[in-house]
């Protein structure tokens, strides 16, 4: 099932947001479910007071970790402890300047190279 509507996501960057609630995945054909590397719209539910993202704003984010396992083409599975996302702007660049925690290799295939380069570990 991956990440569905109204799922709470941790924020894996230093944009100022701490928790997001997924509103809807962007792009056609996905229904109401988002997988690793998908772009979603989300509402900021918790934010730090000095960050750029404010509570109550609607933002775009890319899913970088999911608790539901994801099957890769070689038959292996990847699963994380949390559901997490990184905030992006309209051009697809990350809003924050740092990414915390590991991210999935699928982001490289979906052309989020800046997020992959900022991440401390790519699994």
Curated annotation (Swiss-Prot):
One GO term (biological process): translation
Pfam families associated with the record: Ribosomal_L14
SMART domains, per the entry: Ribosomal_L14
GO MF entries: large ribosomal subunit rRNA binding; structural constituent of ribosome
InterPro entries assigned: Ribosomal_uL14, Ribosomal_uL14_bac-type, Ribosomal_uL14_CS, Ribosomal_uL14_sf
Record-level GO cellular component terms: large ribosomal subunit
NCBIfam families: rplN_bact (TIGR01067)
Protein name, as recorded: Large ribosomal subunit protein uL14
Native source species: Koribacter versatilis (strain Ellin345)
Gene for this chain: rplN
């Amino acid at each position: 099932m991956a990440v569905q509507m109204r799922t709470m996501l941790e924020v894996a960057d230093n944009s100022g947001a701490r928790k997001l609630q997924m509103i809807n995945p962007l792009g056609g054909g996905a229904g109401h479910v988002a997988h690793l590397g998908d772009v979603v719209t989300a509402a900021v539910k918790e934010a730090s007071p000095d960050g750029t993202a404010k509570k109550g704003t609607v933002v775009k984010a890319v899913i970088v970790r999911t608790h539901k396992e994801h099957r890769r083409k070689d038959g292996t599975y990847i699963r994380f402890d949390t559901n997490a996302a990184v905030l992006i702007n309209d051009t697809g660049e990350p809003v924050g300047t740092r990414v915390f925690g590991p991210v999935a290799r699928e982001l490289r295939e979906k052309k989020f190279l800046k997020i992959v380069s900022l991440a401390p570990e790519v699994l």
